[in-house]
Amino acid sequence: MRAAIFRNGEIVVDTLPEPEPAGGQVLVKTLACGICGSDLHARRHAHRMVELTRHLPGRTPMDLTRDVVFGHEFCCQILDYGPGTQRKLKPGTRVCSLPALLIEGGVQGIGYSNDNVGGYAERMLLSEALLLEVPNGLAARR
């Protein structure tokens, strides 16, 4: 899949492996993703964000020697479900979510993570328990 990737201090478009949903996760297609002020700050001052994160309990800082896919304000469409999901929403349903993945042992962020791509990728993984259905008639870009 294609993604806008923060790599070596620049944003580049490249391909990444397709994500595969694990237990409790949902594979989604990104329909729209806002450019947040935090994303702009990260683009210019990622090293400062990493230092700040080191002082926040429970947060894992980004490794700036590895790829990062930003994007934590997104609207997506459900494509598929991983194991152990309830499948309350049909594939094709538009959703948003907190930018976090519920994993065994805790929570991982989406977007400022080397392991969990954000909405600047064509597809991403979300936790089913955190999904919110986008109301019918509301445009994905709103």
What are these regions (language model features)?
Residues 1-4:
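Short structural boundary motif marking the start of a folded domain
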Residues 6, 43, 79-81, 126:
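Short beta-strand-to-turn element immediately C-terminal to the catalytic PLP-Schiff-base lysine
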Residues 8-13, 59-60, 114:
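Short gly/ser/thr-rich secondary-structure transition/capping motifs
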Residues 13-15, 123:
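Well-ordered beta-strand positions in beta-sheet-rich domains
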Residues 17-33, 48-101, 130, 135:
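Glycine-rich beta-strand-centered segment in the early N-terminal region that forms part
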Residues 36:
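Short cysteine clusters
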Residues 41-49:
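Short Gly/aromatic-enriched secondary-structure transition segments
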Residues 60-67, 98-142:
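NAD(P)H dinucleotide-binding glycine-rich loop of Rossmann-like/cofactor-binding domains
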